[in-house]
Design a protein with these regions (language model features):
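Short acidic/polar active-site loop segments enriched in Thr and Asp
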Residues: 83-84, 144, 170
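Terminal signal-anchor or tail-anchor transmembrane helices
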Residues: 12-36
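Active-site-proximal specificity loops/subdomain of glycosyltransferases
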Residues: 95-146
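The conserved acidic donor/metal-binding loop of glycosyltransferases
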Residues: 150-154
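Catalytic-site signature of metal-activated, phosphate-bearing donor transferases
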Residues: 122-130, 140, 157-306
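N-terminal anchoring/stem segment of glycosyltransferases
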Residues: 38-114
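Short, low-complexity, Lys/Arg-enriched N-terminal segments of secretory-pathway carbohydrate enzymes
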Residues: 1-11
Length: 306
C-alpha cells in the first residue's frame, strides 16, 4: 500500500511550523524582556536623578520678582539636596499661593521702590538675607548654612563639602560661571538651558555681569550679609574660604523679554549712574529709548556665543 507524499510530509510540516512558532515566540520573549529591562533601568536612573543626591542642612535665601521656570529652579536645588528656601517675593502675586503651598519654602511678600533699582535691589537683598538668618535660627527647620543666590542662578556641586567645613570656618564663597546662548532665547525656552558657560573670574572670560561669585554663611549670631556677594563673621579671623566643589551657574537675562523688562526697570533713575558694567550701561540707554532693535543688537553682542 502506497502512502501519498502529502500524508508523508504532513507531520514534518506540522513539526516545522510548531518549531518556527516556538522560535518566533522565543525571539519575541527575548526582545520584550530586554526592552523591559532597558526601560526599567532608564526609569530607575531618571528616578535617581530626581531624588536628592545628599540630604543636607543647607538652605537658600533669595529675593525674586517674576521668576521664569521657578518650578525648575526649585526642583534642581531639591535634587542637589537643599533643605529649605527663604524667598522674598516682590510684585508677583500669581506665585504667592504656589510658593506658600511648598512645605520647604518660607515666603515673605515685598515690593520694590521702582527707582534706582540697581542700588536699591542690593539694599533690600542685604536686609532680607539678614532676616532669613534670624528666621533660620528659630523656625525649627534645622538649617545650619544659608547660601545667597538669585532666581536666575543654579547651584552645582557637592553640598557635603559645606557641611564638612570645620567649626572655625564661618563663611565661604563660590565662583560663578555665566551662561551663553546660541540664539536670542524667547518665552518658549527654558531659562536654564545654555550652549556654553563663560568662566568668570578669569582674564577675558566674556562674563558681562558680576565675576566675584556668591557666598554662604553659618546660621549663627556672628554671621551676617556683607553685600550681595559675601557674608561676614564677627569671630572669623581668616578670609572667607573659597569652595572649589561648588559653583553658581548664572543665567543672566535668560530670554529677550526678561532682558528688556530688567533694563527698563533699571533705567528709572533720579541720580548719577555708577554701574561698572558696559553691558548694563548700554542696555539701560537702549531701554530708555525703547529701541528693541538696539536692545537685540546689544544682547547679540554680549550674550550670544561667538
Amino acid at each position: 500500500m502506497k502512502i501519498s507524499r502529502s500524508r508523508f510530509y504532513k507531520p514534518w510540516i506540522l513539526f516545522a511550523t510548531i518549531l518556527a512558532i516556538f522560535a518566533i515566540l522565543t525571539i519575541f520573549y527575548i526582545v520584550v524582556t530586554k526592552y523591559l529591562m532597558w526601560k526599567s533601568k532608564e526609569i530607575q536612573e531618571n528616578f535617581l536623578d530626581s531624588t536628592p543626591k545628599y540630604s543636607s542642612d543647607v538652605g537658600i535665601v533669595s529675593m525674586i520678582k517674576d521668576p521664569k521656570n521657578i518650578e525648575t529652579w526649585l526642583e534642581k536645588h531639591r535634587t542637589l539636596g537643599i533643605k529649605h528656601f527663604y524667598i522674598r517675593l516682590e510684585e508677583t502675586p500669581d506665585l504667592e499661593e504656589y510658593l506658600e503651598s511648598q512645605p520647604d519654602v518660607t515666603v515673605k511678600v515685598g515690593k520694590s521702590t521702582g527707582v534706582n533699582e540697581y542700588d536699591e535691589i542690593q539694599t533690600r537683598q542685604n536686609k532680607w538675607v539678614n532676616q532669613a538668618f534670624e528666621l533660620a535660627k528659630l523656625d525649627g527647620n534645622n538649617v545650619q548654612w544659608l547660601i545667597h543666590i538669585d532666581c536666575d542662578e543654579i547651584l552645582k556641586g557637592d553640598l557635603k563639602k559645606v557641611q564638612d567645613l570645620p567649626e572655625d570656618v564661618r563663611t565661604f564663597w563660590i565662583q560663578n560661571i555665566e551662561a551663553k546662548f546660541d540664539k536670542i532665547p524667547g518665552k518658549e525656552d527654558n531659562c536654564f538651558n545654555a550652549s556654553k558657560f563663560a568662566k568668570c573670574g578669569t582674564k577675558n572670560s566674556g562674563c558681562v555681569s558680576y565675576a566675584n561669585g556668591k557666598s554662604g554663611g553659618r546660621v549663627s549670631s556672628d554671621v551676617s550679609c556683607f553685600g550681595p556677594h559675601r557674608m561676614k563673621s564677627q569671630i572669623e579671623t581668616k578670609e572667607s574660604v573659597k569652595l572649589d566643589d561648588l559653583e553658581v551657574e548664572h543665567y543672566e537675562s535668560c530670554d529677550f523679554d526678561i532682558y528688556k523688562q530688567k533694563f527698563k526697570n533699571l533705567s528709572v533713575q533720579d541720580k548719577e549712574n555708577k554701574i561698572p558694567f558696559s553691558y548694563y550701561n548700554e542696555s539701560i540707554e537702549a531701554a530708555k529709548e525703547d529701541n528693541d532693535d538696539k536692545l537685540q543688537e546689544i544682547y547679540q553682542k554680549y550674550r550670544i556665543e561667538v
